[in-house]
Design a protein with these regions (language model features):
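NAD(P)H dinucleotide-binding glycine-rich loop of Rossmann-like/cofactor-binding domains
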Residues: 49-129, 160
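Glycine-rich cofactor phosphate-binding loops and adjacent beta1-alpha1 units
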Residues: 118-120, 161, 165-244
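C-terminal hydrophobic helical "lid"/dimerization subdomain
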Residues: 177, 206-210, 214, 259-291
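Rossmann-fold dehydrogenase core element
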Residues: 217, 232-277
Length: 291
Protein backbone atom coordinates (compact mmCIF):
# COMPACT_ATOMS: atom_id res chain seq x y z
CA UNK A 1 0.00 0.00 0.00
CA UNK A 2 2.41 2.68 1.15
CA UNK A 3 4.96 1.70 -1.50
CA UNK A 4 2.53 2.98 -4.13
CA UNK A 5 0.62 5.69 -2.26
CA UNK A 6 3.29 7.20 -0.09
CA UNK A 7 6.43 6.80 -2.14
CA UNK A 8 5.21 6.81 -5.74
CA UNK A 9 2.20 9.14 -5.73
CA UNK A 10 2.89 11.60 -2.91
CA UNK A 11 6.32 10.79 -1.62
CA UNK A 12 9.94 11.28 -2.56
CA UNK A 13 10.33 8.25 -4.81
CA UNK A 14 13.42 8.38 -7.01
CA UNK A 15 12.83 6.90 -10.48
CA UNK A 16 14.76 3.67 -10.92
CA UNK A 17 14.65 2.77 -7.24
CA UNK A 18 13.27 -0.69 -6.45
CA UNK A 19 10.17 -0.54 -4.23
CA UNK A 20 9.42 -2.77 -1.25
CA UNK A 21 9.99 -2.26 2.46
CA UNK A 22 8.26 -5.26 4.09
CA UNK A 23 10.09 -8.52 3.51
CA UNK A 24 11.81 -11.60 4.86
CA UNK A 25 14.60 -13.78 3.58
CA UNK A 26 17.68 -15.87 4.23
CA UNK A 27 21.09 -14.33 4.82
CA UNK A 28 23.40 -15.37 1.98
CA UNK A 29 26.45 -13.20 2.73
CA UNK A 30 27.76 -10.89 5.46
CA UNK A 31 30.44 -8.23 5.62
CA UNK A 32 33.74 -8.79 7.40
CA UNK A 33 32.71 -6.66 10.40
CA UNK A 34 29.33 -8.35 10.94
CA UNK A 35 29.21 -10.30 14.21
CA UNK A 36 25.55 -10.90 15.12
CA UNK A 37 24.05 -12.04 11.82
CA UNK A 38 25.01 -15.38 10.32
CA UNK A 39 24.79 -16.83 6.82
CA UNK A 40 21.78 -19.13 6.60
CA UNK A 41 19.70 -17.27 9.20
CA UNK A 42 16.03 -16.59 8.56
CA UNK A 43 15.50 -12.85 9.02
CA UNK A 44 13.36 -9.83 8.41
CA UNK A 45 14.62 -6.26 8.65
CA UNK A 46 13.58 -2.80 9.74
CA UNK A 47 13.33 -0.66 6.59
CA UNK A 48 13.90 2.68 8.35
CA UNK A 49 17.22 4.47 7.94
CA UNK A 50 17.87 7.15 10.56
CA UNK A 51 20.66 9.70 10.21
CA UNK A 52 22.06 9.56 13.76
CA UNK A 53 23.03 13.23 13.60
CA UNK A 54 19.89 15.36 14.00
CA UNK A 55 18.48 16.56 17.34
CA UNK A 56 15.82 13.84 17.36
CA UNK A 57 18.36 11.08 16.80
CA UNK A 58 20.61 12.48 19.53
CA UNK A 59 17.61 12.11 21.86
CA UNK A 60 17.11 8.53 20.59
CA UNK A 61 13.77 9.53 19.06
CA UNK A 62 14.54 7.76 15.82
CA UNK A 63 10.97 7.78 14.47
CA UNK A 64 11.21 11.59 14.48
CA UNK A 65 14.54 11.70 12.61
CA UNK A 66 14.67 14.85 10.49
CA UNK A 67 16.35 12.95 7.66
CA UNK A 68 14.59 9.61 7.99
CA UNK A 69 14.86 7.39 4.96
CA UNK A 70 13.19 4.12 4.03
CA UNK A 71 14.28 1.39 1.66
CA UNK A 72 12.27 1.59 -1.54
CA UNK A 73 12.38 5.37 -1.33
CA UNK A 74 15.90 6.66 -1.95
CA UNK A 75 17.49 3.28 -1.27
CA UNK A 76 16.94 0.05 -3.18
CA UNK A 77 14.00 -1.91 -1.76
CA UNK A 78 12.90 -5.49 -1.30
CA UNK A 79 10.96 -6.28 -4.48
CA UNK A 80 14.05 -8.15 -5.63
CA UNK A 81 15.85 -11.45 -5.13
CA UNK A 82 18.58 -9.81 -3.05
CA UNK A 83 18.80 -6.77 -0.81
CA UNK A 84 21.65 -5.26 1.20
CA UNK A 85 20.90 -4.12 4.78
CA UNK A 86 22.91 -2.75 7.68
CA UNK A 87 23.46 -5.30 10.44
CA UNK A 88 21.57 -3.25 13.04
CA UNK A 89 18.46 -3.29 10.83
CA UNK A 90 18.38 -7.07 10.53
CA UNK A 91 16.01 -8.93 12.86
CA UNK A 92 16.46 -12.72 13.27
CA UNK A 93 13.32 -14.82 13.06
CA UNK A 94 12.78 -18.24 14.75
CA UNK A 95 12.52 -21.28 12.51
CA UNK A 96 8.90 -21.88 13.52
CA UNK A 97 7.90 -18.56 11.91
CA UNK A 98 7.23 -18.85 8.18
CA UNK A 99 8.79 -16.51 5.63
CA UNK A 100 5.27 -15.26 4.84
CA UNK A 101 4.65 -14.33 8.47
CA UNK A 102 8.11 -12.82 8.81
CA UNK A 103 7.35 -10.50 5.90
CA UNK A 104 4.44 -9.15 7.96
CA UNK A 105 6.57 -8.16 10.94
CA UNK A 106 7.01 -4.54 9.83
CA UNK A 107 3.29 -3.60 9.63
CA UNK A 108 2.76 -5.30 12.99
CA UNK A 109 5.52 -3.14 14.43
CA UNK A 110 3.70 -0.05 13.16
CA UNK A 111 0.73 -1.01 15.34
CA UNK A 112 2.85 -1.92 18.35
CA UNK A 113 4.65 1.43 18.11
CA UNK A 114 1.33 3.23 18.37
CA UNK A 115 0.04 1.21 21.30
CA UNK A 116 3.27 1.73 23.22
CA UNK A 117 2.79 5.48 22.74
CA UNK A 118 -0.74 5.53 24.15
CA UNK A 119 0.12 3.18 27.02
CA UNK A 120 -2.72 0.76 26.35
CA UNK A 121 -3.60 -0.82 29.68
CA UNK A 122 -5.17 -4.18 30.56
CA UNK A 123 -8.93 -3.72 30.81
CA UNK A 124 -9.09 -0.82 28.35
CA UNK A 125 -11.82 -0.76 25.72
CA UNK A 126 -10.66 -0.19 22.15
CA UNK A 127 -12.34 0.78 18.88
CA UNK A 128 -10.44 0.12 15.65
CA UNK A 129 -11.63 2.08 12.61
CA UNK A 130 -10.62 0.35 9.40
CA UNK A 131 -10.03 -3.40 9.11
CA UNK A 132 -7.31 -3.61 6.52
CA UNK A 133 -3.96 -5.14 7.39
CA UNK A 134 -3.08 -2.51 10.00
CA UNK A 135 -6.54 -2.59 11.56
CA UNK A 136 -6.64 -6.38 11.81
CA UNK A 137 -3.23 -6.30 13.46
CA UNK A 138 -4.45 -3.55 15.80
CA UNK A 139 -7.31 -5.82 16.90
CA UNK A 140 -4.90 -8.65 17.71
CA UNK A 141 -2.46 -6.36 19.49
CA UNK A 142 -5.25 -4.85 21.58
CA UNK A 143 -6.05 -8.32 22.89
CA UNK A 144 -2.38 -8.99 23.58
CA UNK A 145 -2.22 -5.79 25.62
CA UNK A 146 -5.22 -7.02 27.60
CA UNK A 147 -8.11 -4.99 26.19
CA UNK A 148 -11.40 -6.04 27.74
CA UNK A 149 -13.43 -5.20 24.64
CA UNK A 150 -12.40 -4.53 21.04
CA UNK A 151 -14.86 -2.99 18.59
CA UNK A 152 -14.07 -3.29 14.87
CA UNK A 153 -15.49 -0.74 12.42
CA UNK A 154 -15.43 -1.01 8.63
CA UNK A 155 -17.70 -0.82 5.58
CA UNK A 156 -16.86 -4.33 4.34
CA UNK A 157 -18.72 -7.25 5.93
CA UNK A 158 -16.03 -9.74 4.86
CA UNK A 159 -13.37 -7.73 6.68
CA UNK A 160 -15.59 -7.46 9.73
CA UNK A 161 -16.09 -11.22 9.73
CA UNK A 162 -12.33 -11.70 9.67
CA UNK A 163 -11.97 -9.11 12.43
CA UNK A 164 -14.33 -11.20 14.55
CA UNK A 165 -12.23 -14.31 13.98
CA UNK A 166 -9.09 -12.43 14.99
CA UNK A 167 -10.47 -11.22 18.30
CA UNK A 168 -12.96 -8.39 17.83
CA UNK A 169 -15.78 -8.61 20.37
CA UNK A 170 -18.15 -6.35 18.42
CA UNK A 171 -18.32 -5.31 14.77
CA UNK A 172 -19.98 -2.27 13.21
CA UNK A 173 -20.59 -1.70 9.51
CA UNK A 174 -20.33 2.08 9.27
CA UNK A 175 -21.93 2.05 5.84
CA UNK A 176 -25.20 1.07 7.51
CA UNK A 177 -24.85 2.40 11.06
CA UNK A 178 -23.50 5.55 12.69
CA UNK A 179 -20.27 4.60 14.52
CA UNK A 180 -20.73 7.06 17.40
CA UNK A 181 -24.17 5.71 18.28
CA UNK A 182 -23.24 2.06 17.79
CA UNK A 183 -20.06 2.26 19.85
CA UNK A 184 -21.99 3.76 22.75
CA UNK A 185 -24.71 1.14 22.32
CA UNK A 186 -22.33 -1.83 22.58
CA UNK A 187 -20.08 -0.22 25.20
CA UNK A 188 -22.52 0.52 27.99
CA UNK A 189 -23.44 4.02 26.86
CA UNK A 190 -19.84 5.22 26.83
CA UNK A 191 -17.06 5.86 24.37
CA UNK A 192 -13.94 3.72 24.40
CA UNK A 193 -10.69 4.25 26.27
CA UNK A 194 -8.66 4.11 23.05
CA UNK A 195 -9.94 4.88 19.54
CA UNK A 196 -7.60 3.79 16.73
CA UNK A 197 -7.78 5.22 13.21
CA UNK A 198 -6.23 2.74 10.79
CA UNK A 199 -8.26 3.28 7.62
CA UNK A 200 -6.41 6.39 6.52
CA UNK A 201 -9.37 8.20 4.95
CA UNK A 202 -10.51 11.79 5.56
CA UNK A 203 -13.97 10.64 6.70
CA UNK A 204 -12.78 8.06 9.23
CA UNK A 205 -10.05 10.38 10.48
CA UNK A 206 -12.74 12.90 11.42
CA UNK A 207 -15.13 10.30 12.85
CA UNK A 208 -12.59 8.72 15.18
CA UNK A 209 -12.55 11.73 17.51
CA UNK A 210 -16.17 11.00 18.44
CA UNK A 211 -15.52 7.44 19.61
CA UNK A 212 -13.29 8.08 22.63
CA UNK A 213 -14.72 8.44 26.13
CA UNK A 214 -14.04 11.43 28.36
CA UNK A 215 -10.31 11.58 29.01
CA UNK A 216 -9.79 8.93 26.35
CA UNK A 217 -7.02 8.51 23.84
CA UNK A 218 -7.19 8.80 20.05
CA UNK A 219 -4.44 7.10 18.06
CA UNK A 220 -3.78 7.83 14.39
CA UNK A 221 -1.75 5.25 12.49
CA UNK A 222 -3.50 5.73 9.14
CA UNK A 223 -2.57 8.59 6.81
CA UNK A 224 -5.43 10.27 4.90
CA UNK A 225 -4.31 11.36 1.45
CA UNK A 226 -6.69 14.31 1.41
CA UNK A 227 -7.89 17.20 3.57
CA UNK A 228 -9.71 16.20 6.75
CA UNK A 229 -12.86 18.21 7.44
CA UNK A 230 -13.87 17.72 11.07
CA UNK A 231 -17.46 18.37 12.18
CA UNK A 232 -17.81 20.82 15.04
CA UNK A 233 -19.32 18.09 17.23
CA UNK A 234 -16.34 15.82 16.64
CA UNK A 235 -13.76 18.55 17.20
CA UNK A 236 -15.45 19.72 20.39
CA UNK A 237 -14.92 16.23 21.77
CA UNK A 238 -11.19 16.94 21.89
CA UNK A 239 -11.69 20.00 24.09
CA UNK A 240 -14.76 19.16 26.15
CA UNK A 241 -13.75 15.55 26.79
CA UNK A 242 -10.08 16.41 27.31
CA UNK A 243 -8.97 13.81 24.80
CA UNK A 244 -5.35 12.91 24.27
CA UNK A 245 -4.55 12.72 20.56
CA UNK A 246 -1.51 10.74 19.38
CA UNK A 247 0.09 10.60 15.99
CA UNK A 248 2.19 7.49 15.47
CA UNK A 249 4.72 7.33 12.68
CA UNK A 250 6.87 4.43 11.64
CA UNK A 251 7.85 1.52 13.88
CA UNK A 252 11.17 2.30 15.52
CA UNK A 253 12.39 3.23 18.98
CA UNK A 254 15.51 2.94 21.12
CA UNK A 255 17.52 0.81 21.30
CA UNK A 256 17.13 0.58 17.53
CA UNK A 257 15.14 -0.90 15.94
CA UNK A 258 13.09 -1.13 19.15
CA UNK A 259 10.94 -3.38 21.28
CA UNK A 260 8.26 -3.25 18.59
CA UNK A 261 10.39 -5.70 16.61
CA UNK A 262 11.34 -8.13 19.35
CA UNK A 263 7.80 -8.24 20.72
CA UNK A 264 6.24 -8.77 17.30
CA UNK A 265 8.56 -11.68 16.51
CA UNK A 266 7.84 -13.15 19.94
CA UNK A 267 4.05 -13.00 19.58
CA UNK A 268 4.12 -14.40 16.05
CA UNK A 269 6.32 -17.22 17.27
CA UNK A 270 3.99 -18.15 20.13
CA UNK A 271 0.87 -17.90 17.98
CA UNK A 272 -0.78 -14.86 19.55
CA UNK A 273 -0.28 -12.81 16.39
CA UNK A 274 -1.83 -14.63 13.45
CA UNK A 275 -0.54 -13.60 10.04
CA UNK A 276 -1.84 -16.32 7.71
CA UNK A 277 -5.46 -15.02 7.73
CA UNK A 278 -4.16 -11.69 6.38
CA UNK A 279 -2.56 -13.26 3.31
CA UNK A 280 -4.87 -13.52 0.30
CA UNK A 281 -2.47 -14.17 -2.61
CA UNK A 282 1.01 -15.57 -3.21
CA UNK A 283 2.68 -14.52 -6.44
CA UNK A 284 6.25 -14.90 -7.72
CA UNK A 285 8.49 -11.88 -8.17
CA UNK A 286 7.95 -12.12 -11.93
CA UNK A 287 4.31 -11.12 -11.36
CA UNK A 288 5.12 -8.15 -9.15
CA UNK A 289 3.39 -5.63 -11.41
CA UNK A 290 0.25 -7.78 -11.44
CA UNK A 291 0.35 -7.97 -7.64
Amino acid sequence: GSDIHRYALLGPYVPGTVWGHEFSGEVVAVGKNVTKVKVGQKVTACPALYCGKCDSCKKAKFAQCENLGVIGQHHQGAFAEYIVMEEENVVPVPENVSYDAAAMVEPSCVVAHGYYKVNLDPGDTVAVVGCGTIGLLAIQWAKIFGASKVIAIDIDDAKLELAKKLGADETINSRNKEPFEEVHKVNGGKGVDVAVESAGTPITSAQTFSLADKGGRVLFVGIPYGDVMVKRLYFEKIVRNELKVYGSWNAISAPFPGKEWTSTVHFISNGQLKMDPLITHRLPLSKGVEA
